[in-house]
Amino acid sequence: MRSHDFHEREKKLVQAFRHPPRALNPFLITERHDEKQLCISSRNLHISDFTLLKTLGTGTFARVWLARLKDQTDRTKVYALKILRKADVIKLKQVEHVRNERKSLAAIVDHPFITTLIASFSDEQSLYMLLDFCPGGEIFTYLRRARRFDEETSRIYAAEITMTIEFLHDVHGIAYRDLKPENILLDADGHIKLVDFGFAKQVDNRETYTLCGTPEYLAPEVIHNSGHGLAVDWWALGILIYEFLVGQPPFWDQNPMRIYEQIVEGHLRFPPNMPPAAQNIVTLLCKTNPTERLGYISGGSTRVKSHPFFADIAWDDLFYRRVKGPIIPRVSHPADTGNFEEYPDSDTRNQNIYTDDLKKKFEPLFKDF
């Protein structure tokens, strides 16, 4: 088949992407992976195939755009296109994290609460990941607007996060390592989508030592640099439940070093109106000793789901999206970006250059794109 034919074929695969009409059983997600024509590492797609419509988010070395295929007849079909400049990735020592992100997302397709990697590709200067677009925006925005969530909203979103952690840990041995409201989007139906797998890593039952994450959500063992594993995600879930109900994380200060001190001390202070079951699950999830932490042992997600805080959750109904999302975003059309912040245009001045020397050393590491 000629290169042009491959190009047209891969564009058609991208155009054909549809969310499954209903969530798959977690085991089918894994079993059917090889049958899927998603997560393709394309040698034929190019940035010139897309129209970049609006910036959805920015980071230190990446920018996410709302994008559309130029020759697509369905004008409502849009995607989130993550663009990472190779030179910036190298300068900021993020090569391993970027590779882990693509590897992790490629292993996961059709999970109801995880963003879908449709395709990846690269060119001389940049790496690209084409993802599904979640028009609801960050759950962070809704939390700040409401100041705090009520107990039922907090419970449902915590349950969806719990099932996501369960899947990553028990099926793939992946530690997500960056759980926070900014990395949780809402789809049009008000259900979560976990995004940004830049710190995700397959650790299984081993320990890793990379210091990564956001200060308020770091587990004590990460701060101690004593080796950490899957248990860090259960700690972060406890922090999130607290933040959903109270409006701010339990450990916070203007000075990050003071945040670290508070986390290591581990003294949780609960407002008097916080429900007892919520206080208890946060206390169990935020044990400073990871071996004592709820969810720590193999299959420990079952113990998390069995906690009284989740007593009213119908787990299958929630997973298969038979339960209505507690917050329904205002979305007027499929390409609506009204739930996202405005971002300035990217500054192309003083950009790092992907030199021939860098290319010789690092290009083999980007081959999976």
Explain the meaning of each model-derived region.
Residues 278, 319-369:
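Eukaryotic Ser/Thr kinase distal regulatory-tail detector
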Residues 157-158:
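Activation segment signature within eukaryotic-like protein kinase domains
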Residues 1-44:
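Intrinsically disordered, low-complexity regulatory segments that flank or precede the catalytic domain
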Residues 63-86:
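Glycine-rich ATP phosphate-binding loop
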Residues 53-64:
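Protein kinase glycine-rich loop
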Residues 120:
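Activation-segment/catalytic-loop signature of the eukaryotic protein kinase fold
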Residues 115, 124-132, 140-141:
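A conserved loop-to-beta-strand element in the N-lobe of protein kinase catalytic cores
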